[in-house]
Amino acid sequence: MKKFFLASSILSADFARLGEDTKKAIDAGSDWIHFDVMDNHYVPNLTMGPMILKALRNYNITVPIDVHLMVKPVDNLIPQFAEAGADFITFHPESTDHIDRTLNLIKECGCKAGLALNPATSLNFLDYVMEKLDLILLMSVNPGFGNQSFLPTSFNKLREVRKKIELNSSNILLEVDGGVKLENISEVAFSGANVFVIGSGIFGYTDYNVIIKKIRKKLKNVYSTSIH
C-alpha cells in the first residue's frame, strides 16, 4: 500500500467534460476519485447521483471511487451507489438514527465504510464504531461548496484522530477534505492524514501533471522526514 493517496474531487472538474476531465486527473497521477453527493437538505447544495457514478464507470474509470454522502436520510441511497460502482461509501453521523446499522449496510453492499465528521462534530462518535470503519473523513471546511479555505482548527483534530487510530492498532485510513492544496499539504500530512481530497487544488490548474508532480514531491519529503 502506498503511504499517501490523492483523491481528486470531481466537484471541481469540468462537468461539461466530466469523464474526460476525470480521466486526465487519473492519468496525471490521482489514486482515487472523490465523489461528493449533496441533497440540498443536509447541506445547502445539490450535486450528483448514482447515474453519474455509473456513467464514469462506463467511461472506463477503474480507480477506487470514494463516495461522500452528504444527504439525509442516507440509507436508501447506499445500495444504489454500491450498485453504480462505489468502492468506499462515507456518511455523516447526523444523517442517520443508527450509525452502526448504516455501517453494516455499507458492508453488506460490498463497499468499504467511512464516517465523516464536520469541523464542529465531536470525535466521540468514533468511540464505539472504530472496529467497523475502513476510513475516517475529517472535513476541514463546512460542507456544501468547493473552493473553501482550510480551517486551521483541523490540524489538532487530525492529530487527535490519528492517536485514536494508533491506540486501536488499526489500519483505518484518515482522509481530509476541504481547502487542501500544494501550499498546506505537508502540514496536513504531518498532522496524520494519509488520504487527501483535492478539488480546485488540482482541477484549478491547466496542467494536472505538473501540479500533481509538485504535490507528490511535497508528500515524498514528508515521508522521508517521518521515517528518520
Swiss-Prot record:
Protein's job: Catalyzes the reversible epimerization of D-ribulose 5-phosphate to D-xylulose 5-phosphate.
GO molecular function, one term: D-ribulose-phosphate 3-epimerase activity
Keyword Metal-binding: yes
EC id: 5.1.3.1
Official protein name in the record: Ribulose-phosphate 3-epimerase
Residue numbers annotated as active site: D36, D177
Source organism per UniProt: Buchnera aphidicola subsp. Schizaphis graminum (strain Sg)
GO terms of biological process kind: pentose catabolic process; pentose-phosphate shunt
